[in-house]
């Protein structure tokens, strides 16, 4: 059944491919709305623009260290859908209206200041690393091979350069960004606009929503957060830095 909140109405997505709805976009791509995520007050994430959605499983080594991502289940493409933010939906990852029953408090507490104004900088020989700790989603790609904060200081070595770029680029939250010291340019992975549902194999918990490719995230009050290549949104409902993940799901 559909539910209505704050002027929005959402319907639980069908369990099969909906060719007619998909065709709205494929017939005339020029009319396709730009991807966007609107936060509904004390409710879900309203996703528009036909953003692809799939599971992203963290792959670990024998020691449990995070190494790569493995793509899991892909969901049918839809023009608009609502993703659970309270963490208690019976139809995860989609919203089923449970937030109203449990009186979910989705108050946003995250700063709207630009990332670079909140991050600290660690200097290395050929690279820089910026770090905004409050964004940590506890994916732990920064830990292998001596930890990224130490590795960046060794970037006179090609292997250390490779590891820093890899580990920073795999940080789903964008807490960590590697920079070329000479050019001053960020060393960012290339993402198409899409959403990933992180699944943490080592911790056996579901992680945040991984927003990729510069998708705007707009507060319930209409104010947009800084558009970034990668951020993670809380989907357990318990983050103290809403709407962003703070790693509480793995605590």
Set out the residue ranges of the language-model regions.
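Aromatic (phenylalanine/tyrosine) cluster motif
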Residues: 8-10, 25
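Intrinsic-disorder-associated, low-complexity terminal segments enriched in Asp/Asn/His/Tyr and depleted
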Residues: 18-25
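Short helix-coil boundary/hinge micro-motifs
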Residues: 26-51, 55-57, 188-205, 212-214
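Ferredoxin-type iron-sulfur electron-transfer modules and their immediate structural context
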Residues: 33-54, 108-139, 207
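Short, structured motif recognition centered on aromatic/hydrophobic residues
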Residues: 45-47, 81-84, 93-95, 143, ...
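Iron-sulfur cluster-binding cysteine motifs and their immediate structural context
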Residues: 92-103, 137-156, 166-183, 242-251
């Amino acid at each position: 059944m559909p539910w209505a909140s704050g002027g929005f109405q959402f319907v639980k997505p069908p369990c099969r491919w909906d060719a007619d709805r998909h065709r709205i976009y494929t017939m005339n791509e020029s009319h396709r709305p730009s991807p966007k995520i609107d936060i509904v007050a004390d409710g879900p994430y309203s996703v528009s623009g036909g953003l692809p959605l799939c599971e992203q499983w963290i792959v670990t080594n024998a020691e449990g260290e995070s190494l790569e991502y493995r793509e899991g289940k892909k969901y049918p493409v839809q023009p608009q859908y609502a993703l659970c933010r309270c963490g208690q939906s019976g139809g995860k990852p989609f919203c089923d209206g449970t937030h109203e029953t449990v009186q979910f408090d989705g108050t946003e507490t995250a700063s709207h200041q630009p990332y670079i104004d909140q991050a600290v900088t660690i200097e290395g020989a050929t690279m820089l690393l910026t770090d905004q700790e409050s964004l940590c989603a506890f994916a732990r790609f920064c830990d292998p091979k001596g930890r990224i904060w130490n590795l960046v200081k060794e970037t006179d070595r090609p292997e250390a350069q490779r590891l820093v770029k890899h580990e920073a680029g795999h940080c789903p939250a964008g807490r960590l960004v590697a920079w070329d010291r000479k050019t001053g340019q960020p060393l960012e992975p290339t993402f198409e606009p899409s959403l990933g549902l992180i699944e943490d194999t080592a911790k056996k918990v579901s992680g945040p929503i991984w927003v990729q490719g510069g998708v705007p995230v707009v507060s319930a009050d209409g104010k947009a957060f800084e558009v970034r290549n990668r951020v993670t949104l809380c989907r357990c409902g318990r983050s103290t830095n809403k709407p962003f993940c703070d790693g509480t799901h793995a605590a």
